[in-house]
Amino acid sequence: MKVGDHAEVSRTFSTADIQDYSTLCGHEFEQSRVPEPLIGALFSYLLGVCLPGEGTMYLKQATRYLQTVTCGELMSARVEISRLRPDKELVDLSTTCRDANGRLVTTGRALVYVGDVPRGMQPGV
């Protein structure tokens, strides 16, 4: 891993996704709008599966939501390494999500612990 490494995923949420999420959390959401936690879940996916990947421990996330996303709208979420702290086995990442027109939907930062990430994938290894 090095500063500048990134991972990205694109996703469209359907009204069925919103209904399933509403059932899971016990709260009704406007069916045409994607709830913010579903957008944030894209970052969790990227961090746990792609970069740094399996073994990553999510410590902190700060996200600023700049606009709403409607069902059926394509979004692209991205995480990018902004700082490595190999002495503490920590990685700082920037997090962004854009809509199909390239407009910024969210911006934020994440902090993850990578001590349990397989050797060879850790910073400085």
Q: What role is predicted for each listed range?
A:
Residues 1-56, 60, 119-125:
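Hot-dog-fold acyl-thioester-processing enzymes
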Residues 2-3, 71-74, 78-125:
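HotDog/MaoC-like acyl-thioester-processing domains
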Residues 10, 66, 113-115:
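A structural detector for beta-sheet-dominated domains
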Residues 25, 67, 81-83:
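Short, well-ordered turn and helix-capping elements at secondary-structure junctions
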